[in-house]
């Protein structure tokens, strides 16, 4: 078994792995409380092509020179981690401190889940709603990104859909040839995420920038209070 998020170390440079998934209807959560249900997922077709190549001799010599000089090595692999934070009920504005501390990620994505989604099989844990979120921003080493919080807008109130635009711009839309398949309707009703690409050229770390250290806090403002606690599901890519 291979972690798909860590396959960059196994494939040649400039090789892209594309996985196309067909979204199932929301009535099919692949979870059930029926002990007699013997469901399974069957892969009908899968293929992968790999080619080998020999780098130019000048590149090999350059690597040897850099190693002899003791230059810092940049290893081309990606590490992904997932963290959970609890949001208490009855708040209109809150800060999730220390989402990430120490070595900072070049990308992060945040989704919201309820207690029922985490603990009950009758609730689909793969449906991410806005949970009445109004605005958001992150504070990276004391600096707000963006300077003013992002107003996510809405579909019915004539909003500018700034949240959806921010999401698309921060998931690699300028480096990938395919789109996410998430429409504005999907974004607000079942696939709501807060996404951040911290690289200066919005390449999701494809150019192997030197990583920063520090702290990232998440600031949230809600339209109204909630009676029940919810959770943030934060994943980062290093």
Q: For each predicted feature, which ranges?
A:
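Flexible assembly/topogenesis modules
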Residues: 1-238
């Amino acid at each position: 078994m291979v972690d798909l998020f860590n396959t960059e170390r196994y494939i040649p440079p400039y090789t892209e792995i594309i996985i196309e998934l067909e979204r199932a209807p929301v009535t099919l959560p692949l979870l059930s409380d029926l002990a007699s249900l013997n469901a399974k997922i069957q892969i009908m077709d899968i293929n992968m092509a790999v080619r080998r190549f020999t780098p130019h001799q000048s590149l090999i010599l350059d690597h040897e020179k850099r190693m002899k000089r003791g230059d810092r090595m940049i290893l081309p692999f990606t590490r992904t981690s997932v963290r959970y934070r609890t949001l208490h009920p009855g708040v209109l504005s809150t800060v999730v401190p220390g989402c990430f501390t120490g070595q900072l990620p070049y990308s992060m994505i945040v989704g919201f889940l309820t207690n029922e989604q985490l603990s009950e099989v009758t609730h689909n844990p793969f449906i991410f709603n806005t949970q009445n979120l109004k605005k958001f921003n992150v504070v990276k080493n004391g600096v707000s990104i963006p300077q003013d919080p992002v107003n996510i807008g809405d579909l019915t109130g004539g909003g500018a859909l700034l949240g959806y635009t921010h999401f698309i711009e921060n998931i690699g839309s300028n480096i990938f040839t395919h789109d996410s398949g998430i429409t504005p309707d999907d974004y607000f009703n079942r696939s709501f995420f807060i996404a951040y690409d911290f690289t200066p050229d919005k390449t999701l770390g494809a150019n192997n920038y030197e990583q920063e250290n520090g702290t990232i806090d998440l600031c949230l403002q809600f339209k109204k209070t909630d009676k029940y606690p919810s959770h943030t599901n934060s994943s980062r890519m290093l």
